[in-house]
Amino acid sequence: MSLTTEQKKEILAQYGLHETDTGSPEAQVAMLTKRIVDLTEHLKTHKHDHHSRRGLLLLVGRRRRLLKYVAKVDVARYRSLIERLGLRR
């Protein structure tokens, strides 16, 4: 469920503002999206894992709040981010 160090480095290299950037909203949203995708795959096989389902809903809410913040601060960054992550089909 959690991200390995290699996965985090790869995500941060792709979405962070610089190499060691972990705090920018883009980096946080990208890491949350990876965790959400992994949890969604887990829940497809373990349908009755309600504890993990609640965790998934919390992650989705956190990502939604971060995306709302990015949209409020800079719409161009928001549109670029959702396009790169493949959100909002």
UniProtKB/Swiss-Prot annotation:
Part of the 30S ribosomal subunit. Forms a bridge to the 50S subunit in the 70S ribosome, contacting the 23S rRNA. Keywords: Ribonucleoprotein, Ribosomal protein, RNA-binding, rRNA-binding. One of its GO terms (cellular component) is cytosolic small ribosomal subunit. GO terms for molecular function: rRNA binding; structural constituent of ribosome. One of the primary rRNA binding proteins, it binds directly to 16S rRNA where it helps nucleate assembly of the platform of the 30S subunit by binding and bridging several RNA helices of the 16S rRNA. Forms an intersubunit bridge (bridge B4) with the 23S rRNA of the 50S subunit in the ribosome. GO terms for biological process: translation. It comes from the Bacteria. The lineage of its organism: Bacteria, Bacillati, Actinomycetota, Actinomycetes, Mycobacteriales. This is Small ribosomal subunit protein uS15. The keyword Heme does not apply. PANTHER family: RIBOSOMAL PROTEIN S15, BACTERIAL AND ORGANELLAR (PTHR23321), SMALL RIBOSOMAL SUBUNIT PROTEIN US15M (PTHR23321:SF26). Belongs to the universal ribosomal protein uS15 family. NCBIfam families: S15_bact (TIGR00952). Transmembrane segments: none annotated.
